[in-house]
């Protein structure tokens, strides 16, 4: 009987030690997901707010220059 009680106490003690020393990663994962979501939203918002390409940047048929002029210079085209 005493041996059974000792074994139960030892098992409870070891379980408690395991729970105390275990790294709680659930909160960290939630924070990382929130951080990634925020980063993606900022990226989408920055792309949506940019309406035209600045002077000197490369341009093509699917991009719009702020000046409205995309001029070829050698092999590439640049916004004026």
UniProtKB/Swiss-Prot annotation:
Residues 1-22 form the signal peptide. It comes from the Eukaryota. Residues 23-49 form a propeptide. Disulfide bonds join 52-66, 59-70, 65-79. Peptide predicted to begin at Arg-51, but it seems more probable that it begins at Cys-52, since this position corresponds to a dibasic residue cleavage. Keywords: Calcium channel impairing toxin, Cleavage on pair of basic residues, Disulfide bond, Ion channel impairing toxin, Knottin, Neurotoxin, Presynaptic neurotoxin, Secreted, Signal, Toxin, Voltage-gated calcium channel impairing toxin. Its main location: secreted. Expressed by the venom duct. One of its GO terms (cellular component) is extracellular region. Transmembrane segments: none annotated. One of its GO terms (molecular function) is toxin activity. It is found in: Secreted. The presence of a 'disulfide through disulfide knot' structurally defines this protein as a knottin. The cysteine framework is VI/VII (C-C-CC-C-C). Belongs to the conotoxin O1 superfamily. Omega-conotoxins act at presynaptic membranes, they bind and block voltage-gated calcium channels (Cav). This is Omega-conotoxin-like 1. It comes from Conus capitaneus (Captain cone).
